[in-house]
């Protein structure tokens, strides 16, 4: 089994999926992954569908130079956002795969959330483009490795009601003692 970037605290309650050497932009895919990190699986899938329909956008926080602004970024507190369709489709495929793996393990699909998602750079694929005056420039693509882990949410245990301990200052203690002496 391949090694993941994060180890699950409870492997019996989590499922994983990964894709290697995927021909999809590393920068766009990284921003897409960060947008859904920590989200519930159903919410993340619905959000990515809305991104494909241009109803919502992916916020670009790190790789955002020379990116246009859109009002759809306000939802996330940013001005720069995009709709990277190819990256969204690859991430959707991995989410679907992780959901199927979780179902095979017998996990409850309604309780799943994205506990870990990581995008790494794969080796560049090199080509060449021919320029004026007999020059040649490199023409590289930036593929990605994507890994994600979905985990079943655990039931939150309510804390026991703690007894409220009233702390009195020395002045308050003295006043109470004086009142007891007067009334006694």
UniProtKB/Swiss-Prot annotation:
Single GO MF descriptor: structural constituent of ribosome
SUPFAM superfamilies: Ribosomal protein L22
Subcellular location: Cytoplasm
Transmembrane segments: none
Record function comment: Component of the ribosome, a large ribonucleoprotein complex responsible for the synthesis of proteins in the cell. The small ribosomal subunit (SSU) binds messenger RNAs (mRNAs) and translates the encoded message by selecting cognate aminoacyl-transfer RNA (tRNA) molecules. The large subunit (LSU) contains the ribosomal catalytic site termed the peptidyl transferase center (PTC), which catalyzes the formation of peptide bonds, thereby polymerizing the amino acids delivered by tRNAs into a polypeptide chain.
Miscellaneous: Present with 21100 molecules/cell in log phase SD medium. There are 2 genes for uL22 in yeast.
Protein name (record): Large ribosomal subunit protein uL22B
Originating organism: Saccharomyces cerevisiae (strain ATCC 204508 / S288c)
Gene designation per UniProt: RPL17B
